[in-house]
Every structure is written in C-alpha cells, then in structure tokens.
A protein has these predicted regions:
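Helix-coil boundary/capping segments in enzymes
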Residues: 1-151
Length: 151
C-alpha cells in the first residue's frame, strides 16, 4: 500500500536529488567539465546514512558505484516499501538513481515532485558572482540539464 493512502492527489513540492560526486561535471558542456571539481562531502554526514560503508580512503566514484549496486540488490529492493520513510539521503530509493525515482513516487503515492539540488546552491551562487559569465551560464545549464535528465 502506498504511504499516501488518503485518495488525495499529492504533489511533493520539496524533493531533492542527492548528487553524486561528478553529477554536475557529467552534465556540463565539454568546455566547462574540467573546471568543475567533484563533490567531496567534507562533513561525511551525507554518506553516513547510505546503504554501504564508505572508506575514507576510497575513491568516491568507486564508492558510489558500490552504492548503486546495493540499491539494485534483491533484498534491498524487496524492503523498499516497508522502509520508504526510514531511508534517508543516499540510502533512499530514487535519491540518486533516476530509474528508481518513478518507483519511489509510486510507493509514496505521490503524483509528482518538484525536485531541487541538494549541494550546489552556494556553488552556483559563487559562480554567478565570480565575474566569469560564460562559466556561470555553463554551470547553470549543466545543473538544469542534470535535474531535467533526473526527472
């Protein structure tokens, strides 16, 4: 049974993508990719609730590949409905794997979501005011492309 079993149409107006380390760079035009550093998650809180243990010395991209594999594991998928409100951040179904998002909405019983980034607002603002208008526009386009692709 869906989390929202009221029979009402629900549109979630505050959903977030959990960006992977290279999400923005992967969505950027080639001219800007090398100028966009990967996310580093310096506080570590973002990764603490993930479905795997991250080794502080592990390459983050490799760690996220392991995390994506965990999200596809039969036992993990089988527990999604029961755990939909318990899984947070990168552990949440549909948090960073676009193909899982429709399934998460179905479990939640939501008709749609308005999706925002989680980690890039301050960076986008900094780039907007950096004086490099081409880079600011390039990163904004990468952001919008990434959000659109995810949804």
């Amino acid at each position: 049974m869906a989390y929202n079993s009221t029979g009402l149409v629900v549109h979630d107006a505050d959903a977030h993508i959990m960006e992977t380390p290279t999400w923005l760079r992967d969505n950027a035009d080639p001219a800007f990719r090398d100028r966009i550093d990967a996310l580093t998650y310096p506080g570590g809180n973002e990764l603490q609730q993930s479905a795997i243990e991250f080794d502080e010395n592990e390459d983050l991209v490799a760690g996220f590949e392991r995390l994506a594999q965990r999200h596809q594991a039969p036992d993990y998928v089988a527990a999604e409905e029961a755990e939909i409100m318990l899984r947070k951040n990168y552990a949440a179904t549909g948090s960073f794997i676009a193909e899982d998002r429709p399934r998460a909405l179905g479990i939640l019983g939501f008709a749609s979501q308005l999706v925002f980034n989680t980690f890039y607002n301050s960076r986008l603002c900094e780039w907007e005011h950096s004086g490099d208008i081409d880079f600011a526009i390039g990163t904004a386009r990468a952001h919008n492309r990434g959000i659109s692709e995810f949804c």
